[in-house]
C-alpha cells in the first residue's frame, strides 16, 4: 500500500501530522504501508520522520534539479500520485502545492482524504462543498483555480 502523504511546507505541527497519518491508516485498514514523500519541508519531512520512527518503509521522490523549481515539484508530485494507492492531504487551504496534488489525484482517479489544518470548522465544510462543486474541473484546471475555490467558499460563509 503506497500512501502519498503531502501538505503545506508551513504545517510543522508534528503531533497533529502524526495523528492524521495514524488516523488515515486505521480508518482505511491499510497494511504493508510504504510512505511516499517528496523531500520538502513541513509535512513531507515530518511524514518521513513518522515512518522511520514506526519502522515503515519510505520511498523518497526528490525534485529533479534539471527543471525549474516549480516544474520539478509538479513533476515529482505527479510521479508520487501515479505511484500511490491513496493520498493523504494535510492542507491549510492556502498551499498551491497541495491544491496541485488534489488536482493530480482527480486527474489520475486516485482516492484521497483531506484534513484541514488551522481552519475553522465552517471553512473546512465550505472548502469540502466547494471542492465537490468544482470536482469535474479540478483534473484539468489551472492551479490558479484555488483562488476560485477560496472565493466560492467565502460566499458560502457569507450566505450562512
Predicted feature locations:
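N-terminal acidic leader/helix
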Residues: 129-138
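Charged, low-complexity interaction regions
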Residues: 138-146
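Short, charge-rich amphipathic interface segments used for partner binding and complex assembly
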Residues: 145-160
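Residues that mark the start of a beta-strand
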Residues: 1-4, 34
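Acidic/glycine-enriched connector segments
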Residues: 11-124
Amino acid at each position: 500500500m503506497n500512501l502519498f502523504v503531502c501538505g503545506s511546507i508551513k504545517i510543522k505541527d508534528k503531533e497533529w501530522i502524526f495523528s492524521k497519518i495514524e488516523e488515515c491508516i486505521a480508518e482505511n485498514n491499510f497494511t504493508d504501508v510504504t510512505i511516499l514523500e517528496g523531500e520538502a519541508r513541513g509535512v513531507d519531512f515530518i511524514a518521513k520522520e513518522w515512518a522511520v520512527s514506526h519502522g515503515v518503509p519510505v520511498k523518497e521522490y526528490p525534485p529533479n534539479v534539471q527543471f525549474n523549481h516549480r516544474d520539478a515539484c509538479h513533476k515529482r508530485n505527479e510521479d508520487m500520485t501515479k505511484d500511490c494507492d491513496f493520498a493523504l492531504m494535510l492542507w491549510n487551504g492556502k498551499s498551491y502545492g497541495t491544491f496541485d496534488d488534489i488536482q493530480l489525484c482527480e486527474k489520475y482517479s486516485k482516492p484521497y482524504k483531506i484534513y484541514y489544518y488551522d481552519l475553522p470548522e465552517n471553512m473546512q465544510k465550505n472548502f469540502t462543498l466547494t471542492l465537490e462543486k468544482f470536482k469535474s474541473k479540478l483534473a484539468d484546471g489551472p492551479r490558479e483555480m484555488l483562488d476560485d475555490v477560496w472565493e466560492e467558499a467565502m460566499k458560502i460563509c457569507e450566505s450562512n
